Each structure stands twice: as C-alpha cells, then as structure tokens.
Amino acid sequence: MIEYMNYVIKSLQSNNDYEHLTLSSRSLLNFKIPNAFKFQLSNKSTPYTYNTIDISTNKVINGSITYLYTDAKGLDKLIKDSHNINIQSIVETYNHHCKTLNINKQNVDFKSLYYGRMYYPNSHLEGMIIKKFTTNTQVVLKWVSSFNSCNIITGYFQKYGKRNFQELIVSSNDFLCGYRFLHNFIEQPSKLNNSLYNNSYISLGGEFWLAISTLSPTCATTLRYCTHSATTGRPLTLTLSFNPLFGHLSSTYSAKTSSNSAFCVQYDFNLYSIDSNLSLGCELWKQNELIQNVSQEKSKKQEIQVPPNFYNNNSNDAKQKRILNDLNTTFESSLKKIDKERAVIENFETDLYNKDFTSVWKFSTSLRDKNLCILWDGKFKGFLLSAGTELIRINTNNENNSQSLVKFYPAKLGLQLQFST
C-alpha cells in the first residue's frame, strides 16, 4: 500500500514512462512488506496543501513530517480521504496499460508542486520540486540531505507524449548522467470501427547511464506487449528486458485472470553465469458483499444493421445479386464480431472499475530465494491497514540425529495503519 503523499503525487503524474514499463510484474512479485509497526496521519489543510505525520517503531521510535503544496485545481474529485477512497487507487496492483481504461479518469492540470519531508530523530531531509513549462514538458528536482555529508541532488527533464516519452537525468552522485525513452507502437484505428486489435500495442523503451567520475557505462532495454482476451476481455501483459553489459535477461507474463484475481510469472536468466530463477506471484481481491452496485449491468452490444444489397441495388443479374448478398452477409457478421469484442473489453473494465473492493491478498515466491511473501491490504472503519510477512527457509541440524530439519521463520513482520481526512 502506497503512502498518502505518494497517492497525491501519483494522481497528478502520468505512468506512460520507462519507469512504469514493468509495473504490473513488480506489483505482483516485488511488493513492499512492512517490517515494523507504523502509524500515519494525513490531512488536507487547504485546497492546495497536504500534511502527513507518521511514527514507526523498529527497535527505536522513528518518524517523519511531510508537507506538500501544489497549485492544481479540482483535486477534490481525485483525492479522497481514507474513509471514501477506492482501495484500488492506493494499492500497487496489476496496471492496465490499454487505452480503454480511461473511462472515468480525469486530467488535472498544474504548474508546480513542492514536497518536503524531515525524518526524526536523525534529521534527514528530502525534497522534490516539479515545475511544468508546457502540458507535455516538466522539470523535476529531487534532493536528499543528512548530517553525515550525504547530499545528493538529481534533476530530471521529462517530455511526455501520447506515444513517446523522453527523459534526461543528471545526478551529483558520481556525476551520473542518463537518458531514458519510451515509444508506444499503437495500431491505427479501423475504418469500420474500434475493434479488439486497436487495444493491442507494443511498447519499446531503453535507458543509458554513464558515471562521469568513474567512466562506468550501463544500458538496458525493455519490450512490452499488451492485449486483451477476445472471449473474456481480460487484459494480459508480456515484457522482455535485457541488459547486455551484465548479460541479464528477464521475461514476465502478467494476466488479469478474473475481476478479483491476477497472476504473474517471471523468469530470469544470466547469459554469462548461466544462473536462472523463477518467480511466481498472485493477488486475490475481496468484494464488499453488503453493498452491491446496481449500475454494473453489462451494456448491450450495438449491432450494425447492414441492409440487403448494400453494395449494389441496381443489378439485374440474378447470379450477381446472389454473390452480392453473400458479401453483405459476410461483412455484416464481421461488423457484429468487431462490436462484440469491443463490448466485452469495455464491459470487463467498467465492471472492474465500479466494483467495491474491501481488501486484497498478495502472495509471491521465488525458487532461488526459497521464500514466501504474504501481504494483506484492506479497509476497516475508515482506517487503511497493511500487514505482511516474509517467510524464509533455513536448514537446522537435529542434535539427536544428524538429519537436517527444514524450518521457516519470518524475516519480516509488520503492520501499517493510515488515516486521512
């Protein structure tokens, strides 16, 4: 479960960038597990300012104070308190990349955003400034400061587009410079209608880095394919990532198996060391059984009526008329099939968006790490709760006999509570 300030920033930013190219697999496999007790209290003091204070206990008491200001208007329609928030908005879950998801999404325009956070008792500071010059270009400045002379400043110049994304990065840490890009290969809409195939597209992204102080380069590229099932309308995503310098190859398959579940499998392989790993992850959503949304009825498919002899009504030849009637019947069935596929996709995503979920279970495991990660996110009486653990496998020797026993013990265990007004 993401924090409140990240939820506010996420509502203002686009996820059409290289960083979110493999978001679906990361959300199902590498989700964050709390390792201590943490309580976070947030509120919206003015229409443009947000405040957060949190306290955590991990052997010692730690905490932080966060402040955010933005000149965005109309955030009341997007930012909800913990009692009215949609749990799908604050949980890192399967990311729908296809175009039909933007059913009820609203765009909020803003020119600047200021974010600051101070940790205590160590007094670490972190901040961020986002300044938009145009609708598609912005500059992001992030910095981290502490008393042990650890001061890092990183600047980003980002340019967004419907199909393209470009980003230049400069950091004071080893004078690191980087360039990241993303291009979406979207098929042109059909002249007849928007069909299933217009919701399938390929995304290609890459990143190039160079540490000027040590002259250490690195690069990576990622390919993503998104589509829907023709019969059920459920989305699925395939990614392939490759780092040529380290020889790391990673492939993922993520699918929304139903409106209440998602599954992901990832296979990693190194070309140089021949090491491999297989990771599995899934999430199970629970719907509120007391509150049923009446408006979740499936929309009726729109049938396109093609009149007989549509292409030629002036032919006097009986044989030619029979051929034209066969052509009309063929095109009519194709149009109905196109509309049926589109209706199935739109109905699935509309039904998913309108469902009232109360909690979600997440599970992930890895053959190489031999662990089991469990996370539960949910709502209870206006509070947002997140509890999880990571079980790892260890071998212990039995004193009575020399046989080794396999045991599992929790390497991480924690509980996080959030409340916002």
Curated annotation (Swiss-Prot):
SS bond list: none
Instruction: Provide the topology term for how it sits in the membrane.
Output: Multi-pass membrane protein
- Where located? Mitochondrion outer membrane
Q: What is its main location?
A: mitochondrion
Q: Which residues form a coiled coil?
A: none
Taxonomy, superkingdom:
Eukaryota
How is this protein organized at the quaternary level?
Component of the ER-mitochondria encounter structure (ERMES) or MDM complex, composed of MMM1, MDM10, MDM12 and MDM34. Associates with the mitochondrial outer membrane sorting assembly machinery SAM(core) complex.
What's this protein's function? Answer: Component of the ERMES/MDM complex, which serves as a molecular tether to connect the endoplasmic reticulum and mitochondria. Components of this complex are involved in the control of mitochondrial shape and protein biogenesis and may function in phospholipid exchange. MDM10 is involved in the late assembly steps of the general translocase of the mitochondrial outer membrane (TOM complex). Functions in the TOM40-specific route of the assembly of outer membrane beta-barrel proteins, including the association of TOM40 with the receptor TOM22 and small TOM proteins.
What the record says about family reads:
Belongs to the MDM10 family.
Tell me the protein's name: Mitochondrial distribution and morphology protein 10
Origin species, per record, is: Vanderwaltozyma polyspora (strain ATCC 22028 / DSM 70294 / BCRC 21397 / CBS 2163 / NBRC 10782 / NRRL Y-8283 / UCD 57-17)
